Regions:
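Metal-dependent polysaccharide deacetylase catalytic core of the NodB/CE4 family, i.e.
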Residues: 1-71, 101-103, 109-122, 151-153, ...
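Generic structural signal for well-ordered alpha-helices
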Residues: 7-11, 45-49, 75, 138-142, ...
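Anion (oxyanion) recognition and catalysis
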Residues: 14, 79, 178-179
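Conserved beta-strand edge residues that scaffold enzyme active sites
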Residues: 27, 67, 92, 191-192
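Generic structural signal for helix capping and beta-alpha/helix-loop junctions
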Residues: 30, 70, 95, 193-195
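Alpha-helix N-cap and loop-to-helix initiation/capping positions
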Residues: 36-43, 125-129, 165, 169
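Active-site-adjacent pocket scaffolds in enzyme catalytic domains
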Residues: 53-54, 58-148, 202-204
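C-terminal domain-boundary segment and adjacent tail
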Residues: 85, 135-207
Length: 207
């Protein structure tokens, strides 16, 4: 677990005020392994959240399962343990409420398409083509956002986007987005907090 093994990285993230989102106890210990053993899944999540609070100094508010492999029980466990955002699902460009047995939790959707690993490492796009893809995605969502807000989640991995030529291109994309009006750069916690204050109803139940 990086919280245990890479404290200097965690300290640097905290100093910069970046959001830290728990990503399971171990990358290869998928929650789906416990799909038929909810007690074990609950224990893994609880252990992860306890260590997070010990190291980070505050409770976690959002969760992204390793490999996006949550179970039907995951949202309810997260809500039970005090989280407000669950980020595994890929099915929308807007946040929405998941109604669990412990109350609602906000789904802040993730994206596998708009993700440096799938764009470059798997997709084989050139740096310029990849950034053009990001701009096209942003432009479409920006237009739709004139009617109702949209989320553009860009998944980045240091060993992929961290190549010098890609860093320069990423900087170009960020400046492109910053040049637009009415664009918000929130954390998942901020999105969920805002959405909980706005959403009128729950739309599905996870038990």
């Amino acid at each position: 677990m990086i919280l245990v093994e890479r404290r200097r990285i965690i300290d640097a993230v905290k100093e910069r005020g970046w959001e830290l989102v728990p990503h399971n106890w171990a990358q290869n210990d998928l929650l789906t392994y416990y799909a038929h053993d909810p007690d074990r899944e609950s224990a893994v999540i609880r252990r992860t959240l306890d260590k997070y609070q010990e190291v980070v100094g505050r409770p976690a508010k959002a969760w992204l399962s390793s490999a996006l492999r949550g179970t039907p029980y995951t949202p309810a466990f997260l809500k039970e343990f005090g989280l407000i955002a669950y980020c595994d699902y890929l099915n929308d460009d807007q946040p929405y409420l998941i109604d669990t047995v412990h109350g609602p939790i906000v789904c802040v959707p993730y994206s596998n398409d708009i993700n440096d690993f799938n764009i470059f490492a798997r997709g084989g796009l050139s740096t310029h083509d990849g950034i053009d893809m990001l701009k096209l995605c942003f432009d479409e969502l920006y237009g739709e956002g004139a009617v109702t807000g949209r989320i553009m989640n860009v998944g980045l991995h240091p060993h992929v986007i961290g190549q010098p030529h890609r860093i320069a291109a990423l900087r170009e994309f960020i400046e492109y987005v910053r040049g637009k009006t009415k664009v918000w750069f929130p954390t998942r916690e901020q999105i969920a907090t805002w959405y909980l204050a706005q959403a009128p109803q729950h739309i599905r139940r996870s038990t």
